[in-house]
Amino acid sequence: MSLTEEIKKRRTFAIISHPDAGKTTITEQLLYFGGEIREAGTVKGKKSGTFAKSDWMDIEKQRGISVTSSVMQFDYAGKRVNILDTPGHEDFSEDTYRTLMAVDAAVMVVDSAKGIEAQTKKLFEVVKHRNIPVFTFINKLDRDGREPLELLEELEEVLGIASYPMNWPIGMGRAFEGLYDLHNKRLELYKGDERFASIEDGDQLFANNPFYEQVKEDIELLQEAGNDFSEQAILDGDLTPVFFGSALTNFGVQTFLDTFLEFAPEPHGHKTTEGNVIDPLAKDFSGFVFKIQANMDPKHRDRIAFVRIVSGEFERGMGVNLTRTGKGAKLSNVTQFMAESRENVTNAVAGDIIGVYDTGTYQVGDTLTVGKNKFEFEPLPTFTPEIFMKVSPKNVMKQKSFHKGIEQLVQEGAIQLYKNYQTGEYMLGAVGQLQFEVFKHRMEGEYNAEVVMTPMGKKTVRWISEDDLDQRMSSSRNILAKDRFDQPVFLFENDFALRWFADKYPDVTLEEKM
């Protein structure tokens, strides 16, 4: 198979949702159809002993939530599928946002009882900003939920995107009978031995079912007043195809997967800082690091840099340019993933995600090129933390483990590090409380370094240039610090302290990140 044909086979997407909408469960079912697991491990608490394949970190297994993005790959129906299962918890939006820079499409999972929730809306806005296609899976039809028409209306109003139902539920909860498949023009049956039936058989099958008449009325209404189906509108991110189903009972998931792969886009190009778009079919290899993860194998204390291949082909042992440093690197020890399990890979192509063993060479956002190519891809989003804690080792004899743990976890981008300019104290910044809990858990579990964490409360953060730096500007209400890149930064007690500082030092430029 030619390189072009291989690249065109790739389908790389992220699954996004609000916590508990069933995102990890649907990921499990997709892996099941891809032949990667024998049974889908439903998400359960710590007593059951059954854990989701994509939730590999101890704290994820204990809590039943995803706090880091998993990467999984399988072959299905002539396509090579790369799934990125993202954290649903709002504290981990930074990791999720970066992950969304590495995909060509998104699958949005919605709880049929709750509709569009806060985190779903937040993540959708990022996807919309990138104009990537969104496919919607309305989940949990095995439970009682809201009316399908009401859910479609909310989706369009809240998210500002047109929708087109690919199927329609026949009943819900205990009265759930199946799906009226508009795209494949058939019925998918929830009960009984037969999986499918023709539309013509519907009247006989559901002769005594009051829901079926309502279904036919709803479909007639949608055909008269609903949006037209347009493959181009889907690819442009203007229309979301909507699928109903139940991930827990594995109903409607395979039909979704088949149809998704029919319409999901091939790998797309990425913009450089100079505004050029690198074509995925270009011969020369290029890619970018969108995530760094330490201790995927705690026994080996390893670090993996996740790279999205943008163009060309990776071959084991190839040399690359690291544009940020101007130095070269050799890609000899490279893996692909199934959550925590992995295998060495000798070649991969545009659209694929590879893991490069990292000894401290790479940073999130790094561009890799070959030959004379020295361009950089557009920077990944960074976020200003809102809450802070001082951190120190509980045992001074564990200083080495403490520093190694902090260095690796900060390089992952899971938490941000600041150092007090005058005292040298370490301060951690996060967008939510859960990040601190995960940091503490991982420091103790992965690095055997107990930590003392002292809350500092909320802070307003602004960066300044080295030229404007004057240590006399620091006070109890505005702490002068350095970030992990040694850039000077002020942590203001509140907005009032920020305004007071700006009035007192009008010539100092204060910079805000995202």
Swiss-Prot record:
The gene is prfC. GTP binds at residues 17-24, 85-89, 139-142. Belongs to the TRAFAC class translation factor GTPase superfamily. Classic translation factor GTPase family. PrfC subfamily. The lineage of its organism: Bacteria, Bacillati, Bacillota, Bacilli, Lactobacillales. It comes from Streptococcus pyogenes serotype M6 (strain ATCC BAA-946 / MGAS10394). PROSITE patterns: G_TR_1, G_TR_2. PANTHER family: PEPTIDE CHAIN RELEASE FACTOR RF3 (PTHR43556:SF2). Residues 8-268 form the tr-type G domain. GO terms for cellular component: cytosol. InterPro entries: EF-G-like_DII, EFG_III/V, G_TR_CS, P-loop_NTPase, PrfC, RF3_C, RF3_dom_3_sf, RF3_GTP-bd. This is Peptide chain release factor 3. It comes from the Bacteria. NCBIfam families: prfC, PRK00741.1, small_GTP. GO terms for biological process: regulation of translational termination. SUPFAM superfamilies: EF-G C-terminal domain-like, P-loop containing nucleoside triphosphate hydrolases, Translation proteins. It is found in: Cytoplasm. Keywords: Cytoplasm, GTP-binding, Nucleotide-binding, Protein biosynthesis. GO terms for molecular function: GTP binding; GTPase activity; translation release factor activity, codon nonspecific; translation release factor activity, codon specific. The keyword Lipid metabolism does not apply. The keyword Cytoplasm applies. Increases the formation of ribosomal termination complexes and stimulates activities of RF-1 and RF-2. It binds guanine nucleotides and has strong preference for UGA stop codons. It may interact directly with the ribosome. The stimulation of RF-1 and RF-2 is significantly reduced by GTP and GDP, but not by GMP. Pfam families: EF-G_D2, GTP_EFTU, RF3_C.
